[in-house]
Amino acid sequence: MNTKLNVLFVLFSSLVLAQSKDGYWDNIRTTNETIVLGAGKKKMIKTADFPLGTTEVVYRISILDDNQKISSSLVSVLKAIPDPTGISQGSAGAVFLASTISGDDKCKYVVFTNEKDALEYEKSSVLKNACVVQNEPINKEAKLLSEKSKCLNGNQNLWFVFESDNWIMKQKIVFEVVPWVDYKFKNGWTNAAKKELLSEVEKND
């Protein structure tokens, strides 16, 4: 009984601390890729490994003309945002994070949590177990994925498959990903770990 009370106290304390997020945007373990995509082709990109304690991920996609360059990187934009609560889940937040520069070309993309499904989609267009599907062609996009997303379930990477919407010319895509690391979860104290510990306590009660 005492063991159970101690565990519940620790859990309660962690929930109280979670009310005021404290962490950082990891500007070292980011993904920053410039992709040249052939006309009508697909290409898979694996993100850099997410650090332990990643609870949110921001990604940005910018399709550029040959002579265009990104004016401000996603890392530099996020410096003005102290934590993910400052990013709106609505269109306003997406517009703020999205690049101010974009070209005329567009692409579609799908996000997977494992390489096998991503490769199958890239090679044969068989769509299975995707956590984000963007079927409407876009020329720029910026999104926040939270720990509640199907995309973030303790996995270290995400796999993005981009598909060109241009059937004549190749296109250039700048792809950026920045993880948010929560100090409380850096030592592996995640929601999944909490559930597992509670389950063990209930079994032994």
Model feature map: region roles:
Residues M1-D22:
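Bacterial Sec-dependent N-terminal signal peptides
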Residues Q19-D205:
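Acidic, Ser/Thr/Pro
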